[in-house]
C-alpha cells in the first residue's frame, strides 16, 4: 500500500473509495495499485 498526498486511478480497474474518512484506491487486477491518502 502506497501512502500518497494525491491518490489517482492508475488503471481502469482502480476504484476510489472512502474508508473511515480516508480516501483510498483499491484495484482488483493489480494489488500494487493500492493507495491511501495521508
Swiss-Prot record:
<dbReference type="GO" id="GO:0005737">
    <property type="term" value="C:cytoplasm"/>
</dbReference>
<keyword id="KW-0687">Ribonucleoprotein</keyword>
<keyword id="KW-0689">Ribosomal protein</keyword>
<dbReference type="GO" id="GO:0003735">
    <property type="term" value="F:structural constituent of ribosome"/>
</dbReference>
<dbReference type="Pfam" id="PF00444">
    <property type="entry name" value="Ribosomal_L36"/>
</dbReference>
<dbReference type="GO" id="GO:0006412">
    <property type="term" value="P:translation"/>
</dbReference>
<comment type="similarity">
    <text>Belongs to the bacterial ribosomal protein bL36 family.</text>
</comment>
<dbReference type="GO" id="GO:1990904">
    <property type="term" value="C:ribonucleoprotein complex"/>
</dbReference>
<dbReference type="InterPro" id="IPR035977">
    <property type="entry name" value="Ribosomal_bL36_sp"/>
</dbReference>
<dbReference type="GO" id="GO:0005840">
    <property type="term" value="C:ribosome"/>
</dbReference>
<protein>
    <recommendedName>
        <fullName>Large ribosomal subunit protein bL36</fullName>
    </recommendedName>
</protein>
<dbReference type="InterPro" id="IPR000473">
    <property type="entry name" value="Ribosomal_bL36"/>
</dbReference>
Amino acid at each position: 500500500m502506497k501512502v500518497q498526498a494525491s491518490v489517482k486511478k492508475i488503471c481502469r480497474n482502480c476504484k476510489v473509495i472512502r474508508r473511515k474518512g480516508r480516501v483510498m484506491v483499491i484495484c482488483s487486477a493489480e494489488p500494487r495499485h493500492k493507495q491511501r491518502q495521508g
